[in-house]
Regions:
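Hydrophobic alpha/beta core scaffold segments
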Residues: 1-223
Length: 223
């Protein structure tokens, strides 16, 4: 899906840290630039009105046991118009749930339905949380409009570094939109990764594309 970019350097290649991969670790990159840039998040969902209140949860394991009182999988299936036995990754990708914080919807994606009727989530969950089911509308058009809006602010893109949720990839596969989206990303100089969770202004989100768009130097300004 994403383009790849090869960087050429005369510096020696750094080995892995102590020659191994490390769990519970992170790489932090700090960048200072005079280029015009924009940090952004985009998603393509419209929310429904019915509220789903988490009434029992194992927050440490990200498991919701009950929603609105009944078992979580049963209540979720009722709201989306499906049978519990039909709940699978494609269904969860098509109809995730969101929590609203300060008027902004943040997706809380479901990982799987469990044999005991509970639901395991990909991100933090808590009792009392109010969720709403959302449905995807025109992923490709949403992405085009997002790029157009950012371009109007910072000018033509030199590079866009993006993290795109793997569940969006599933949805694109299901809808047949993958090639059209790939063309759009290439045409907008997007490089990046399919990810298992994104972060935007300190909030952990799912099923979004987050990124940093970099423009060209403003007239009269050096890098």
């Amino acid at each position: 899906m994403f383009s790849t970019t090869r960087l050429t350097t005369s510096a020696p290649r750094a080995p892995p840290h102590n020659g191994a991969f490390h769990p519970d670790s992170a790489a932090l990159l700090l960048v200072n630039t005079r280029l015009p840039f924009k940090i952004f998040k985009t998603q393509h969902f419209t929310s429904e009105e019915e509220r789903l209140v988490v009434t029992e949860a194992d927050t440490g394991q990200r498991i919701v046991r009950k929603i609105n009182g009944p078992p979580a999988a049963e209540e979720y299936a009722r709201v989306v118009g499906a049978h519990v036995g039909d709940l699978n990754p494609m269904r969860f990708a098509a109809t995730p749930v969101v929590v609203t914080i300060d008027g902004t919807d943040y997706v809380r994606s479901i990982q799987r339905a469990n044999p005991d009727g509970s639901l395991t989530f990909f991100c933090a969950i808590d009792e009392g949380l109010v969720l709403r089911v959302v449905r995807g509308v025109d992923l490709l058009g949403n992405l085009e409009r997002t790029f157009d809006t950012i371009r109007a602010e910072i000018g033509p893109f030199q590079l866009v570094m993006a993290c795109d949720c793997i569940l969006r990839n599933l949805e694109m596969t299901q809808s047949g939109a993958k090639e059209a989206v790939a063309d759009l990303l290439r045409n907008n100089h997007v490089v990046g990764f399919s990810t298992y969770g994104e972060q935007y202004h300190g909030v952990h989100v799912n099923q979004t594309l987050t990124g940093i768009a970099l423009g060209y130097p403003r007239e009269g300004h050096d890098l």
